[in-house]
């Protein structure tokens, strides 16, 4: 260590003798350690660089091989996997993506004047159905009102395209039957839209018909114009109810056509429902249930007890016994028969379940931030629940027992309900349900 310079020491001010040497020693130690670490890092870096060059060469060669193999595999697999996947995704996002052949389209007659707000929503639903389903539609209605609805709802372009393509045909009719008019008015208004719609089915110009109008007038017109099937005393209205299994609904009939029934009527309803469930819903052996207040054979009123005896002796169907109200939506039955009064009450009750359930859930969810977060997580689930319970998703009910496929819609039907109802009509027509229904013979027991 060099001797301390007195002049410099004086100039720099007083300083401790032990402080300066200790600081220098620490600096030297730090420098030596740093130099050693730097040397090690440098050699390691050089080695890593050399190894990286070698590995880079290998990886580059392997990468080119993998790239070439990937290109070959992609060219081979892409037409088999990715293209169909893209087509599937595009068709899901856009139902109109897949072209429908004209040869596959079936004629369906639509009562354009039937409904609370007809003809606007009915026409809107028909135009949407033409784009999504293999259908041609004969739209029966008062010409001026129909064309006015086209302008008012902004459907001019779609209407012109459908008519030009031959997918939509406007059939002029006279004054329609009002929603509040008596059913017998169809005898006086011979050129009403509901009567002309039935005539199209009777003449064979349409395979099915749909109306959201006066249900009593529709049933009367169907009986007068089409006639009842052989062996059927009273037609019945059959509606599809959701069950625990979203893919397998239950058919409930009658839901409003016959307020007072005899045992033989319910027996015939079971035969009609059995054929419809088998042909259209594709149930191999439909399980038939009789709506009652208990499972035991002795339960219920005189109508239920006598009907139970008839169904137990019927070999043309699989009778699964009495069905309590709690079992209707359980999935234990494929067809449930009842009188029209009870069935209509059950139908109207079910229509309210979806909205009431959502209202209860909204009321029970906590308010504030916790409620908003919980609602955000549950929103998609609640929408799916509402969709399964929404009567608009099922569209309509079938009038079974007449010589033609007739679908009855709700008076307040919107476009979605119309599309669903027309899908139901197309399904019944394409499965040839009328051929099997026409083969029904008179029920063996007539004294009941």
UniProtKB/Swiss-Prot annotation:
Keyword Coiled coil belongs to the record: no
UniProt GO MF annotations: phosphate:acyl-[acyl carrier protein] acyltransferase activity
GO cellular component: cytoplasm
Function: Catalyzes the reversible formation of acyl-phosphate (acyl-PO(4)) from acyl-[acyl-carrier-protein] (acyl-ACP). This enzyme utilizes acyl-ACP as fatty acyl donor, but not acyl-CoA.
Pathway where it operates: Lipid metabolism; phospholipid metabolism
Full protein name: Phosphate acyltransferase
Catalytic activity field: a fatty acyl-[ACP] + phosphate = an acyl phosphate + holo-[ACP]
Locations listed in the record: Cytoplasm
Keyword line: Cytoplasm, Lipid biosynthesis, Lipid metabolism, Phospholipid biosynthesis, Phospholipid metabolism, Transferase
Record GO biological process: fatty acid biosynthetic process; phospholipid biosynthetic process
Family, per entry: Belongs to the PlsX family.
Region (Phosphate acyltransferase): 106-448
UniProt enzyme class: transferase
EC number: 2.3.1.274
One Pfam family matching this protein: FA_synthesis
Subunit structure: Homodimer. Probably interacts with PlsY.
Main location: cytoplasm
Gene that this sequence comes from: plsX
Organism the protein comes from: Prochlorococcus marinus (strain MIT 9313)
Stretches the record annotates as Unknown: 1-105
């Amino acid at each position: 260590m060099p001797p301390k310079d007195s002049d410099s020491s004086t100039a720099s001010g007083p300083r401790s003798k032990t402080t300066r040497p200790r600081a220098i020693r620490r600096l030297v130690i730090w420098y030596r350690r740093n130099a050693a670490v730097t040397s090690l890092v440098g050699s390691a870096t050089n080695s890593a660089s050399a190894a990286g060059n070698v590995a880079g060469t290998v990886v580059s060669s392997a990468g080119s091989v993998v790239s070439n193999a990937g290109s070959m595999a992609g060219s081979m697999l892409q037409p088999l996997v990715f293209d169909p996947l893209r087509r599937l995704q595009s068709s899901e996002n856009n139902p109109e993506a897949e072209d429908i052949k004209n040869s596959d389209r079936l004629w369906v007659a639509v009562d354009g004047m039937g409904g609370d707000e007809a003809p606007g929503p009915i026409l809107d639903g028909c135009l949407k159905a033409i784009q999504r389903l293999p259908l041609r539609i004969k739209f029966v209605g008062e010409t001026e009102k129909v064309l006015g609805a086209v302008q008012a709802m902004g459907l001019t372009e779609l209407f012109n395209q459908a008519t030009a393509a031959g997918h939509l045909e406007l059939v002029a009719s006279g004054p329609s039957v009002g929603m509040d008019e008596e059913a017998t008015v169809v005898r006086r208004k011979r050129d009403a839209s509901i009567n002309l719609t039935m005539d199209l089915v009777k003449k064979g110009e349409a395979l099915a018909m749909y109306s959201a109008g006066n249900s009593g007038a529709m049933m009367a017109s169907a009986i007068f114009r089409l006639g009842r099937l052989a062996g059927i005393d009273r037609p019945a209205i059959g509606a599809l109810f959701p069950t625990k299994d979203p893919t397998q609904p239950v058919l409930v009939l009658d839901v409003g056509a016959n307020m007072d029934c005899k045992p033989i009527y319910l027996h015939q309803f079971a035969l009609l429902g059995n054929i419809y469930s088998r042909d259209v819903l594709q149930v191999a052996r439909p399980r038939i249930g009789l709506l009652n207040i208990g499972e035991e054979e002795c339960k219920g009123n005189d109508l239920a007890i006598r009907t139970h005896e008839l169904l137990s002796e019927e070999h043309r169907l699989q009778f699964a016994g009495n069905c309590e109200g709690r079992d209707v939506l359980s999935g234990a039955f494929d067809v449930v028969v009842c009188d029209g009064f009870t069935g209509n009450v059950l139908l109207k009750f079910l229509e309210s379940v979806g909205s009431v359930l959502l209202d209860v859930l909204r009321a029970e969810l906590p308010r504030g931030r916790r409620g908003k977060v919980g609602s955000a997580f549950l929103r998609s689930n609640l929408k799916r629940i509402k969709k399964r319970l929404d009567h608009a998703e099922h569209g309509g009910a079938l009038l079974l027992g007449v010589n033609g496929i007739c679908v009855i819609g709700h008076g307040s039907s919107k476009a979605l309900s119309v599309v669903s109802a027309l899908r139901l009509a197309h399904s019944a027509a394409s499965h040839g349900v009328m051929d099997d229904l026409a083969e029904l013979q008179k029920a063996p027991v007539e004294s009941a």
